[in-house]
Amino acid sequence: LHSGIGVFSGKQRTREEENTLCEVWAEVAEYAGRSGITIGIEPINRYESYMCTSAEEVLRFIKRVDAPNLSLHLDTFHMNIEETSFYEPVIAAGSRLRHIHMTESNRGMLGEGNVRWDDLFRGLQEIDFNGNLVLENFSNSVPGMAEAVSLWRPSKYNADELAKGSLAFMRKMTCEHQ
């Protein structure tokens, strides 16, 4: 769950928007909770959203809503833009962290960009993370993908190569940080 992509007011988030956000999250959490569903709130970078752009903001709103089934959903692509550390948001979230999109800084092959994977996995190990690590690769060899996520340069890898190579990298990192 995250705010609308590319929808901006042109101003900083207002108190009224924050209140509305909390009201909506409370209602969604209550509805989902009746079915035992946990909702992950994903901070999205400032170029795509202005409502919640960092883990700290999401955690503050989760605390305000105070619903046990609201959690943090991190995405390493957005973290690379908005966070100063890949370790600290993981530690700050602790058991509230339930889901992570594993994406390289350039949305390409994991391990070939700027994401500090060792810092991320060290944090995950320290909090005894047992949520979902989800590979999120994008290749413009997939029709429509370039327009959807602004991949304007040709991909170095096709979708299958990207998935296989990135999955191998995730497995290697997971084994190194057990």
Describe these PLM feature segments:
Residues 1-71, 153, 157-161:
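Active-site acidic/histidine proton-transfer and metal-coordination neighborhood
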Residues 52-74, 79-178:
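Histidine-acidic metal/acid-base catalytic patches
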